[in-house]
C-alpha cells in the first residue's frame, strides 16, 4: 500500500493571510488530483465543511484530504491539512503545523505580504516545517491594475524578497540556505487558484512554455485554455513532491525539535525513524464529530501502526481506550482502512479521552508532545 512507503508520503498544509485564497487552493488541488467533480470545485469550497465556517467564509477547523499524485512514473501520497487561517485560532494552527512537514505559503499578488503572512511563516518555522511559496490571484494584476509583464515580474520579485526576509529571521540555522524560496530553484509558483492554473520556472521549462504566453492567456481572459496549458494541481503537486520533504526524512530532524522526551528512548528512536513496527505514537490535532462513528481523533501518526481493537493510552488519563476504527481522509470523507502506519495523517475512533493536543500511545509511559494542563 502506498501509505506504507514513507519516501513517497508528503504531509503538507497551506497557510495564508485571511482571504488570500488558501481554501480555494486546497480545494482545487484535491479536485485536480481526481476527487471532486469539475464544476463544483471553486464554488463548493470543499474543505470548509462546517456550516459555521461557510457562513463566515473562513476556515475554522483544519480539515484533511489525502491525494495521490503521479510524478515521473511514481505514485505519491499527499496528505493535506487545511490549517486555520485566522489568528484567533492560534492553538489550532500550531497543532496543525506540528502534524506537517512542509507548507505552501499563499500570498495574494495584489495585496502582497500581510501581518498574518508573517504569523503563519513564524509558526511554520517554529515547528520546523519547510515552506514553499504560491503567489495567488495573479490575474487580478491585469484585470485591476493593468500590469505589464515586466511589472508583474518585478512584483513577484518583491514578494519573494519579502518572504525571504521573514524566513531568514526565523529559520532554524541548519536550514538557512535550503529553506529560502527561490523561483529558479522551483520553490515558488504563481497563478490563480480560483481559475485553476499555476506555473513555475521548472514547469515552463518542462512544457516549453514562456511567461509571455502565460501573460497573453491572462490578457485575453482565456481562463479555460490557461487551466489546460498550466494546470494548478500539476504544478503545485509537482513542487510538493520535489521540494518538500518526505515523512521519513522530516521526522529525523523534527522529532527531536517538537517532542519533549529523550530521543534515545525506544519510542524516540521509533519516531525519529518513523518505524511502523515500534510502539505507536499519535499526536491529535483535532477531534471531529461524526454522525455515525461519534468522536474521531485526527492527527499525525509518528510511529508504529494502529488497527481496530488496539488498546491505546491518552497521556494524562489513567485508563486504556480501545480503538473502534482507523482510516484516512479524502476531502470530508473518512475512508476506513485495516490499519494505519507511521508517517501519515490518520483518523481514529474509540479514543474517548482524546482531545485536541493529546498524545496517544500504545506505551502508557510515553512522554507527551504537550504539557498536560489540568
Please give the residue ranges for each predicted region.
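Structural and coupling elements of P-loop NTPases
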Residues: 1-374
